[in-house]
Design a protein with these regions (language model features):
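Sec-dependent N-terminal signal peptides
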Residues: 4-13
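Sec/Tat signal peptide C-region and signal peptidase I cleavage site
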Residues: 13-21
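Low-complexity repeat regions of mature extracellularly deployed or surface/particle-associated proteins
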Residues: 20-238
Length: 238
């Protein structure tokens, strides 16, 4: 088993910034891999080994039974990930504003992206979060949990579901959610939201199977579009 723990700090003394942005580049292949990364400060990057200073590409993790723990504490941080794994456990924490989370998990069906357990915690505003799970595979038994506290955040999730569960809890104004779940087996999406001026678009399109959706939202000036389609007539939002 491989385990790596990385901690970075950006320090301030007498009001002057002494250290430039931190960048972590990762390319890992093999099973049973654990990685912990913590970055404290602003403008930090986590991505791939072919990145160059100031320009980040997606990190590359290939294998099965992997655990990834990412903590970025500060503003304007960026995490880009290209993960190919079965039995993948991911914990992603972002505390700050204007952060970017851009991850795809097994998009080409190398391992199938089964039995993943993902938790995404966001505290802050103007963050851009994107997760693509098993676009050409089946996210069997996926357990996905989001906790978002802040305003003007954008969350995009695209999942090829197979008995997957997706729980999202949002507290804040002017947030946007775009969720697309398709595949050949049913999935469950539960969204709890508290805030104003929200825009929520949900598409559930399991081919000839059942999908479940529960939305509880409290606030003013909301726009909702819900599409459920099990291979019937094509529909779209106005």
């Amino acid at each position: 088993m491989k385990r790596i723990t990385i901690i970075f700090f950006i320090s301030f003394f007498s009001g002057y910034l002494l250290v430039a942005d931190n960048e972590v580049s990762i390319d890992q292949s093999g099973a049973t891999f654990n990685l912990d990364v913590e970055q404290l400060g602003a403008g930090n990057l986590i991505g791939g080994s072919d990145a160059v200073a100031g320009t980040m590409t997606a990190l590359d993790l290939d294998g099965a039974t992997m655990t990834l723990d990412i903590n970025q504490i500060g503003d304007a941080n960026k995490f880009k990930g290209d993960i190919t794994a079965d039995s993948f456990t991911g914990f992603f924490e972002f505390d700050g504003d204007s952060n970017i989370f851009d991850v795809q998990i097994d998009p080409n069906n190398t391992f199938g992206a089964d039995s993943s357990n993902l938790q995404v915690n966001i505290t802050g505003s103007s963050n851009d979060m994107s997760l693509d799970q098993a676009l050409s595979a089946m996210a069997s038994s996926l357990d996905l949990d989001w906790t978002i506290q802040g305003d003007t955040n954008t969350i995009d999730a695209d999942i090829d579901i197979d008995g997957a569960t997706n729980y999202m809890n949002i507290d804040g104004d002017d947030n946007t959610v775009n969720y697309n779940g398709d595949g050949f087996a049913g999935g469950y999406f539960h969204l709890t939201h508290d805030g104003n001026n929200r825009e929520i678009t949900v598409t559930q399109a399991s081919t000839q199977d059942n999908d479940w959706l529960k939305i509880t939202s409290d606030g003013n000036n909301g726009t909702f579009c819900i599409i459920q389609n099990d291979q019937g007539t094509s529909t779209s939002c106005p």
